Amino acid sequence: MCKVLIADDSEVMRTAIRKMLREESSIDVVGEASSFAETMQKIADLKPDVLLLDLHMPEKRDFKPALVKSQLGTVCTVAVSFSNDTDSKALAESYGAVTLLDKMKLYNEMVPAILRCESRESDIGSLLRKTFKRKAHAT
C-alpha cells in the first residue's frame, strides 16, 4: 500500500484529489496539509511514501527549495500546479519532484505518477535485498 500525503492550500483541491485517489485500492491517503509548514510536520509524523505537492501555496517564499528538499528525505515528490510553464518546472525540480502534473489533467495523470513512485521504491528495495544477499553469500 502506497501512503500519500496531499499538500495543497485549496480545500477544494485536497478534497477532489482525495476522492480521486480513494478509487485506487493500492493508494492510502494518510493525511492532508494546507501549508508548507504543516506539510513538513506531517511528513515527519506520517512518513508518507509519496507527497503530492502544490507548488504555489501562498507562503512558499518563506521556504527555500534546498531546505524543503533536504527535509523530504526519501519521500517521492509529485508536484502539481495549474501552470506548467518553465518557472514551475524549474521550481518542481528544485524541490526534487519526480514530475510536475497539470491540475487540469490530474484525473488521468495522478495515479500513474504515484504508482511510478511506488515501483521506484520497490525496485530500490529489491536491489538492496539482492545486494545484501550477495554480500552475505560472499562472506
For the regions a language model picked out, list residue spans one by one.
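Conserved sequence signature across two-component system core domains
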Residues: A7-D8, A33, L51
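Two-component/phosphorelay signaling modules centered on CheY-like receiver
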Residues: E11-G31
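Conserved phosphotransfer microenvironments
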Residues: F36, L52-V68
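Conserved phosphotransfer cores of two-component systems
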Residues: A44-L46, V68-V75, Y95
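Active-site beta3 strand of CheY-like receiver
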Residues: L46-L52
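Hydrophobic/aromatic residues positioned on beta-strands within the core alpha/beta folds
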Residues: A79-V80
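Alpha4 helix (beta4-alpha4-beta5 surface) of REC/receiver domains from two-component response regulators
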Residues: S83-L101, K105, E109-P112, K133
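CheY-like receiver
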Residues: E109-L115, S119-T139
